[in-house]
Amino acid sequence: MRRVHVSVTGTVQGVGYRYTLQHVAQRAGVTGWVRNLRDGSVDAEVEGEDAAVDAVLAWMRQGPPGGHVTGTHVVELAPAPASAGTSFEVRRDG
């Protein structure tokens, strides 16, 4: 299992980034969350099997049509407790 925190910059708000990421994450079978930040970036946490996390990260670096990712910052985290969640959710803006 692998868990990462990701900050994404660029044109990533108002282009469907969070909801498309939720769909991509659910199809990959990972858990976590995504939210918009006030500075115009997107913040996310992704956890799952290594290959699934890598696939989601690859999508996050590209983003949806209409978006333009200029940077991603990935920080490796310790695995979450088993009770941390079983889905990938879109959170309220932070």
Where are these regions (language model features)?
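Intrinsically disordered, low-complexity, mixed-charge
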Residues: M1-G94
